[in-house]
């Protein structure tokens, strides 16, 4: 069965950001944006919340996990990029990604922030509880719940012959 797809516009992304902002009851010392999906929402949130200390994390999981029906939790992530521990220690850190599907990537970043002495809080535009591998664990902040495969406006190829929209 083919998964349902949802194609978002930039206005949709703005509305999701507007839905997130009132959820934050306190401030954060810094933000980690997960590459690549968290960079755009992270930038928008950082600007709106005046977070100055912006950091990037890039995580990779073994490719064979993607092909499995239900990926194992025990696979070790490879951190291609991660902030130095002294940038995290003692800070309240907002970790931002576009979507929590399986939850593996953002959970790996959250655990590494905790291990470095930081206080992590997770934030995504979309939470998919149907793909979540972590039971009752969920993002601290999310704008929407979905079962769809989300296509964000930055992912839409503007060339009409090869775009995602053309193939739907």
In which residue ranges do the predicted regions lie?
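PRPP-associated nucleotide enzymes
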Residues: 1-168
